[in-house]
Each structure stands twice: as structure tokens, then as C-alpha cells.
Amino acid sequence: MRTFNYSAIREQKWDSDVLGLIAAIYKEAGKQELYLKQRPEELEKLVEIAKIQSTEASNAIEGIVTTSTRIRQLVEEKTTPRNRDEQEIAGYRDVLSIIHESFDVIPITQNYILQLHKNLYSHMNNPLAGRTKSVQNYITATYPDGHVETLFTPLAPYETPEALDRICEEYNRVIGNMELEPLIAIPVFIHDFLCIHPFNDGNGRMSRLLTTLLLYRSGFYVGKYISLEAKIAKNKDLYYDALAQAQTGWHEGNEDVVPFIKYLLGTILAAGKDFEDRVALVETKLSALEMVRRASKNRIGRFNKQDIRELCPSLSLSSIEGSLRKLVENDELKREGAGKSTVYLRLK
């Protein structure tokens, strides 16, 4: 069976990319702490928006979808689930809320992970909720011609409970003893979790919820204000590529987890940069036009209305579209393409 020794990671020599990402994340975290002290009320506006985006994106990655209106109503608990997808979305909302409110009293143990998994399915009858997998699972790819290829075989069901215990013990030990930088330990833990693939269903969503939990417990709160899940969903091909690279040789213990570490740290840093941009937009009461104007000035090269929506999540899509039209009419932006392929370029 695969063994785990997180202390050995200390011996690894990290390249300048990894070290640079870690330094930049700490710098952004310092700025975020300052904003939180100075403008807590304004930042609260970002929390609910991030919850909605996180719930929508993390489920969409797994093909679990409903309309944007229904997502908002479900996250705000103004409606009840109508179908299986909405039941799963409501479960994700519940677990995310638990993590937001109680992260400091949720230990990283198998029992608590199983409880969170059970809560993920609390709106439906799933006899496997809160239990490790009962059958062997596989990570596969389906190609355009219809053939399916196995990319990775996770641990067998009988090996799973012990492995889940071991990664929790190793993580808690190196964090508790301050042996390992949390921004290294967190991606390593999440990568091992995904390679174990402990559940029959819900592994991807649980991995993203655990990422948020581990970051909060280590003092990195950017995911509360900027959706990490939305960042992953936007670049999910890069996410799967990094994961596939890092899984090679995992069973033998000679994997190279650096691609996954870089991917996750890059995502956290990108969220930190977005936090700065978004704070600048909520600091003062601006018109929709001025918000979109300022957001467009944060973009380099071509961008679309979805890019602006990420920076101005408090605006409706119709407000963003109307503002973009006015900026084009004012010769501040140039529009290219049509329909879904419409993009914009700054002229000023």
C-alpha cells in the first residue's frame, strides 16, 4: 500500500516559481488583512457573491447545473431543491456555510471529512453519503470517437480508510509542528486526497471544499471573498492537466507534485489579485457605467462580458451589457465579433 511521509517534503528543493508564488500570496494576504480591519462592512458585500459563484462553479465542473436565478435562490435559501442537481447544489451550499462559520473548530480527521461528505448529500437519499467507497473507481477520459481511457486508478476500497487516516495524521503533524509551509502542505494533502479518491461520488467537490477549509485554518481567507472554485472552473483544463502530471508515479511514491502545487498556488494568487480589484470597485458607490469602466481598465488585451462580470459581480448581466454598449459608443472600447464570441478592447 502507498505510504505517506510529509516530513520528507522538507528535503525538496523548490524552484523560484514556487517560492515566488508563496511570497506573493503572503503579500496579498497582508493587504487583505488590512482591508478587513479598515472596511469590514464593504467586504461583506463580496461574501454572498463569492458563495453563489463558488456553489455554482464547483458543481458545474462536475456537470451539476441549474439556472443562475435558481442558484442564487438556493444559496440564499429562498427556495427548495426541485431535482437531483439542485439537491446536490443545496448540499454544497450547506457544507460551504459550515466551513465559513466554523472552520476553526473543524479538525482535519477522517471522521469530520466523512461528516462533511454526509452533509453534502443531506438533501437526498444517498446510502453511500458519509462512507468511503464500496467499489473501485477510476479516473477516465472519454474521447470524441466514444472510446474511454483510464487515466488513473485510485486506491482500492479496502485501502481507503487507512490512507485517509494517514494523510490527515501527516498533515496535522507537519502543520502542528510547523515543519512544513502550509502553502506547500495544503496542495500536497489535496493531491493525495484526489489520488485516494475516497468516495463513490463527490470527490472533486469535497476536494475543493477541503481546500477552502485548509486555507481558512491556515489564515488565508481570500476564498471567502473571491471564489476559488470559479477560478478553477474557468481554467479546468489546466487543473486536470496539472493533476494528471502530478499523479504519474503516485502509487510508487515517486510522483512529482510540483505541477499541482504551482496550479493551486497560482489560483490562490489570482484570487488575491481579484480581491484588490474588487475592493477598489466596492469602496465607493459608483454607477454601473463607472464600475464597468474601471473594471475594463483592469483588463489587458481582449476581454468579454464574463471577465467584467467577475470583477463586478454585484451588477446584473443586463447592466454590464448596457454599460459596455455605452463605452463602445463613447469610443472608450472597441467591440469585435458577435453573439457569444463578442470581445472588447480598450481604446483609452
Regions found by a protein language model. Give the residues of each.
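FIC/Doc superfamily catalytic core
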Residues: 1-348
